[in-house]
A protein has these predicted regions:
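Short, flexible turn/loop "capping" segments at secondary-structure junctions
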Residues: 18-19, 152-154
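Long, structured ligand/cofactor-binding scaffold of large enzymes
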Residues: 31-143
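Conserved small/polar residues in nucleotide/adenosyl-binding loops
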Residues: 156-158
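Class I SAM-dependent methyltransferase SAM-binding "motif I" and its flanking Rossmann-like core
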Residues: 142-152
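N-terminal amphipathic, basic-rich helices that act as targeting or association modules
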Residues: 1-54
Length: 158
């Protein structure tokens, strides 16, 4: 059986052939953080001791889950996110520009062959443009922000 699209993307990204069940460290092309998770990502990033983003141009912060704010605490997420973006030089910050996953593909942040992660389970929708993508938690996102890498498990063929 030939390689799957995901295996081809991983091979292009890492320069290594993978087989089902392999754990591989990939170089991340793009990440998306949405407004609900930014306070947790920011806290964990600094707790891990990172002092700069691996590549601010590859990080996208999108305010969409809490827009418009329905509770006073929602606005805290906006203030924390704006402060984090300013402190670490993030230039891709979107406020009320649309649903995060549609924006990531329609604005060209994610392209065919990319490896992308986001703080939402629907991040897998980036496969619609031929990318490998996965939703992750705030600890994994904080680690990516500092290192630019992430481990993945090559899936078993069915």
């Amino acid at each position: 059986m030939g390689n799957t699209v995901i295996e081809k993307i991983i091979r292009h990204n890492t320069g290594k052939d993978v087989k089902p069940g392999d754990i591989v460290t990939v170089n991340v092309d793009r990440v998306m953080i949405h407004d609900i998770f930014i306070p947790f990502v920011g806290d964990k990033f600094e707790e891990m001791g990172f002092t700069k983003l691996w590549d601010p141009d590859k990080v996208v912060l999108i305010y969409d889950h809490l827009v418009p704010a329905s509770q006073l605490d929602d606005t805290r997420h906006f203030h924390v996110g704006d402060a984090f973006a300013a402190k670490y030089g993030m230039t891709h910050v979107h406020r009320s520009d649309g649903i995060c996953h549609q924006l990531m593909t329609e604005a060209g942040y994610v392209k065919p062959g990319d490896v992308a992660f986001g703080t939402d389970s629907h991040t897998t929708t980036y496969g619609c443009v031929g990318a490998f993508s996965s939703g992750i938690g705030y600890t994994e996102m904080a680690s990516i922000l500092g290192t630019g890498t992430m481990w993945i498990l090559s899936l078993i063929h069915i």
